[in-house]
Amino acid sequence: MYVTTLPSPLGDLYLASDGTALTGLWIAGQKYFASTLPAEVTENPSLPVFRQTENWLQAYFAKAPLPSLPPLRPEGSPFRQAVWALLQEIPSGQTRTYGALTQQLKAMGIPAAPQAVGGAVGHNPISILIPCHRCLGADGSLTGYAGGLEKKKFLLELEGAL
């Protein structure tokens, strides 16, 4: 497992990779920080997937046209994978409620409850690129962001969703 750190307007971002795909992206101080990392990691800032992620993040924070996402490989249960896949379908500048995601999962034949969806969203190991910040409470309120509500607000304002 390989790791590196990148500066950002949110503070340091910590990246992890299996060598070919991004497996983690955490904001400094984030809840569940690096929870999927093994004890042994190697610092390798020149890894191609890290360079691709850095280019994507630079464009994102500059509000420039986004290049292709780097390959992503988040680790999680099939339920969490389904939730994270739905998060990736939410366009920049838009949001969804936990309840709306729950209904989408049910329509796909996946039993779900908003609390379970919230748990999956909260344990997203690849922040920003899997846009869990686009998920809101039933009343449209900013709730539960592992990176902190101030950072969630910053990202949604950057995207024009607030």
Regions inferred by a protein language model and the residue ranges of each:
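Major-groove DNA-recognition helix of helix-turn-helix-type DNA-binding domains
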Residues: L129
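…primarily DNA-binding HTH/wHTH and HhH modules…
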Residues: A138-L162
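N-terminal positioning helix adjacent to the helix-turn-helix/winged-helix DNA-binding module
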Residues: F79-V83, A113, K151
